[in-house]
Structure formats: C-alpha cells, structure tokens
C-alpha cells in the first residue's frame, strides 16, 4: 500500500484522532507518542488536510497545499466577536 492509498482510505474519524494525538502529544488512552509517531502522525494529518480541508481553519493546510494563517480580525469574525466602539459621540 502506498502513501496515496493510505491518505485516500483514511476516514475523517481517523484523521481527527491523529490530529488530536499530535496536538496533545498522547494517544486517547494517555500513552505518550514517541518522536517517530509524532512525526508520522503530523505528516499524515498535513497530507490529509491538503486533500480534504476545503474550509481550512487557522494554521491548517488548505487543498492548495498552503498553510492558512488568518489575521486577528478574520479570527474575530469567524468566532462572531464584534468590536465595540470605545466612545460614542453625539
């Protein structure tokens, strides 16, 4: 099985588990990832994102293979945070 087959057969649930493991540095059962596991999981997560991440979030890989970095303003809009005026003049 080659890398393309692995990525194409990876279900979203598997991607999510690998992503969480990379973020936390441990498996769901609490066992820490080895350095090799971290590297391999991160590579799989990034490759999966590059193929399936249509609505890319901040600091993820989009389908063009580019890292998505959003400004503070864009993140505030995504989270529904609106800036309140400092002062009101009549």
From Swiss-Prot:
Lineage: superkingdom: Bacteria
Protein name: Uncharacterized protein YeaC
Taxonomic source organism: Escherichia coli (strain K12)
